[in-house]
Amino acid sequence: MKKREKILLLFLALGLFLFGCGAAKQPPSGGEPERLNLYGVDFGLEDEELDLSYIRIGDGWRDVLKTARRMPNLKRLVMDSCGVQNEDMAVIRDALPETEVIWRINFGLQYTARTDATRILASSPSIGGNVTNRDLKKFKYFTKLRFLDIGHNEDITDLSFVRYMPDLEVLIIAMNPLGDLTPLADCKKLEYLELFYSRTDDLSPLAGLKNLKHLNVGHCPYLKDISPIYDLELERFYLGTFASCPVPPEQVEHYRELHPDCEVDNESWESSEGAWRRAACLEGEKLEWYKKQPYYSEERQYYAPRYALLRDQLGYDGLQYSTKWNDPTWQYVGW
């Protein structure tokens, strides 16, 4: 055999060998996708969800991230109570922009919620403990929150966390020594806001909130000017008496003239009662409209319509506070 033919045969044999090696690495046609086991959980690389909840992962979160990056169809990664720091969970979330990454946040003494929560009711220190500014630093991870009640906690002064809540519709922050409302300017979907018994003196951050319809600023002793929100098309505006909220009467009357359809109350003393929560004597079309709403019931016939809806949104009926015993997904893990 000539030398040239030997060289050609050698190259041909080498090519067949390399092709065979490559083919061996591929799964057989029509075979099952590759499966892995991570922390005792069996899953496939083609899976759309990976749930590692209640497994102590801690510093092993990097292995989870490395694996998740190999899963092209991954839509949800759930790591509830895995002992991973919030900051590290945020790294995973940011590294997987096409995947919903979910973990658990504990706050107060008994309050808890997963980061995919849309509602948090944490307004009873006697039930869940006091919510503090330190707790609220963790609220930036609740990016899907729509309804939030953290009133009655007495120590809250920082609202910066709401900048991370683009879908926030309802905020009750009443009975806290809060002053600066600047972060609320980013909450473009905000529709309902209770600020009574706070230290706010400037409503200008609310001026651009075109969806805001219900505003309660009763018993805000430092508030003396409502002119920044003259253009807001509110449906209900509660200020309380001049003694409790010293806004000049001429400003109140000017707002009434600008918005004749708005229910403006600067006469009632109690900021959470009266027409704010209790229905006036509804008659005719208004009464018939109210009866057709899904949140209406015979038990709620004396509630103001918006307050009846609020009870549904925040789970007031049944005292659905965001506590461990009210959360069906919570489990004790011991770490």
Task: List each language-model region with its residue ranges.
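Hydrophobic membrane-insertion alpha-helices, especially the h-region
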Residues: A13-L16
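Bacterial signal peptide processing site
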Residues: G22-A24
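C-terminal motif of bacterial Sec signal peptides marking the signal peptidase cleavage site
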Residues: L18-G20
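Short, solvent-exposed mixed-charge patches
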Residues: G334-W335
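Bacterial N-terminal signal peptides that target proteins for export
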Residues: M1-L8
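Concave beta-strand-loop units of leucine-rich repeat
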Residues: G30-T157, F161-G179, P183, K189-D201, ...
